[in-house]
């Protein structure tokens, strides 16, 4: 009895209300789920007593416990009768490896006779009998409690204390929820009141037995679904199957042990999820029924521990699989959290078990235990994705690279597309295509040779492949296996097997013969049947073809093949079915890449062995380098190189330096000075080439808007070098928004100290005065980067100038019409500039006036070329683009900002340099460029004539970089 006093006393609720339906169902569900992982003896609580006078249970040994994968042993007659007369649910439930069945107590014959006599004599239900026999049961419990306290004294006390505390906490949360939502959750009595009401209802209806009919029980309460704990436990492997835990004696309060501190909060999450995803997820329990069961501990236990995984549709699965990496990391970390972790989201739509593990429906497609040999799949977006062994993350398909482009890099598919599938338009009617037009099935009768049917690709094999290979897998040989794999010309008839007609070549599987444009076959290789992989390779260098079987080379089958051949496969008897692989998947024959490397080496050795007929390569290369340096006006470098190689100049050195100066002016944006030097040094060049002059003028107009050629306003001024700002404002906008400062300097001087922005990278264009102290347009400073227009005075530079207002590129875009429309728009802008009458504004206005005047002159020049029919479409577009820059307050960020890029000056300088050399009777291009262009053209000609070597030659091979 001392051991009984040490153990915590059983609650009055549990002792007096042993047959309460809520506690009984919760205890029964707990015994089914095996959440505690221990054996539950039927005599540990009066709510689980199935006989009036149970005997003390005998602890079962590890050998007596049944294996979790095998069913429980059949019950004897006494146990069957006791369960039929018991008010508790004994419907069959699935057994999992976490829980071992409770040991059954033997029932003697006198006890059975005594129980039958009591049932015949007494009319009250079994509940009253059990209440009357409770003192005897308490006496029988004492030895069992002594044993429990001896084995687990401290653990049992701590567990019961935690259980009682959690149970009262959950009951308080449930009452608080009912008070907040009186409409959604109807008021229900507390645990004590419901148990009292249960006894009163039983006493009021003594004639109605509470014994359930075993035939109706499965319909009234179906077996519970799989537990998340069970599935989570099965993931750990099969080594836990034989592990046995010591038996624990659990009373009615133990049902709260599987409910953690977040149980009620997670129950609320289930209801919130039902409201949010009602259209895309199916919930097993009705929401109204669930709300009515939340107030009971059994309902909370069922909702928390036994959760049916909903079936997600493909529409709802897609957005969840596209979560970012942060969500993936968060979901991965949640798998290692315990049951008290508060990092779980309330709005999650996944399911969490009692130990904090994260589950989703994708992880368990079928509720079958996974074997220990199954490897775990990675989680993506909180869901487990099952990968197939065939899919490799290192394959080109997963890296976003076309494998055919890697296999045939020299093929230009815009001109000669690669065969990638069978053509649905170039086939016989008896042929059926499926699986992206890669699977071929015969659908004819197949009685005669005329019943043969073939299919080919939509495009022929490009000769620029050099070496082309494809494979065909025999899915089924059909009735007779009359199949042919080969090559055909475009005019091949599709009711014949490849090889029977002219310009068709095939390898047949029924006899292993090769057919070359004839009905008479030649002995070639073995036959092939279901499961074999047949490959066909075409060599465009020597115009041969060979076949492979299951990765083994069978030797050359055909020679002297024509060009433009199509991959073809032919079938003849019912049931024949094949799959094609044109390079999308790895080949069975893995020596294609090595063969291509060997052929490439042979072609390069052939080029190196070609005899040099003219002179030694050293002298030829020296002349090529010298002419290239002279052509591009690298005067100092050319002079040093010719002195080292003992070569002479064909052009005067002074002419080379003049061209060099003009090229530098163009590259720095000083178009007006470049044009002036060209007219002075090479008279008659621009006058006789009006199109070139017009192109230079268009570029000059662009540089004026850019601010690099402001000296065009006055020919006596020069400008320093420019930089390319990222947010430059046009000269037009700067002059329109110019404001004169009212600073108290007295002399009207200005300060240009604020000439750079935060990036400190731009250098302003300074206009230097050439005479006179009066401020004029030549005394203007335009800061291209800081959007300031500053007046410069030769006496002092101390007075600050207000910065011009910065405008975004939100100006109205004007349509690029003809030249007259552009001139009218320029006139309108010119009239607008007359509004500002301040002296400084007039100076800035003169700048824009000069730009507009130059634009009118350029427009007139374009009209003159139009009259003489000398204007090309390229020059017409150039003029429209240049005039369109006026419409933007920030030309750099406009759609035409590429015109202001310094790289656009190179083409203008190259054109002018070539024109100058041509006027001096020199070549427009250096000889080195001619050689490179000639070699490129020869490679194209080789490909056009289907010689095959072009697949293994590039410009870098002919002219190596090192």
UniProtKB/Swiss-Prot annotation:
What CDD domains does the annotation carry? SPRY_RanBP9_10
Q: Which residues carry this modification: Phosphoserine?
A: 387, 393, 395
Ranges annotated as biased composition (Basic and acidic residues): 80-91, 165-202
One family name in Pfam for this protein: SPRY
Residues annotated as region Disordered?
1-246, 271-296, 313-402, 800-820
Query: Which family does the record assign?
Result: Belongs to the RANBP9/10 family.
Question: In UniProt terms, what function does this protein have?
Answer: May be involved in JAK/STAT signaling. Isoform D is required for the proper arrangement of niche cells and is autonomously required for proper niche cell size, isoform C negatively regulates the adhesive properties of the niche. The germline stem cell (GSC) niche in ovaries is made up of two somatic cell types: 8-9 cells in a single-filed array make up the terminal filament (TF), and a tight cluster of 5 or 6 cap cells (CpC).
Name of this protein: Ran-binding proteins 9/10 homolog
- This protein's gene is called RanBPM
